[in-house]
Amino acid sequence: RIGIHGNPFHMYKFRSMYNNNNQVTFDENKLNVIKRPDDPRVTKVGRLLRRTSLDELPQFLNVILGQMSLVGPRPEMPARLSQYEWWQYKRFEVPQGMTGWWQVNGRANRPMHLNTQDDLYYIENYSLWLDLRILLRTVHVVRTGAGAF
């Protein structure tokens, strides 16, 4: 994944998909992979891990290693950078996080293009209070499974 200042790092995560699966579903422009509840690439155990957000737990190691923060924009996949507009690179001015404004405001229930806008909102309004608010809302989102699939 891509982290702060555009530096690549290995993001730890439990595998929730079949290895080397080519059954990808794209959006109407054939540009972005659609994340959907019935994704055929996700294993049965993976579905449980994702629904409970347990697949994210290994990222605490990234936080301990200083590669990620608890709160911040999600780390991006390198392949997606070629689709970025110049203004979207601002997401990399702060450490990437395990949770963030997009995750507590709908996650996969919202259009993917809004995640960059949510990340920019977070960056422009950063404060300890906002981080605490996001962490508290994360607990609620994880407990209810909202937007997780």
Question: PLM features: residue spans?
Answer:
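Conserved small/aromatic sequence motifs within transmembrane helices
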Residues: R1-F149
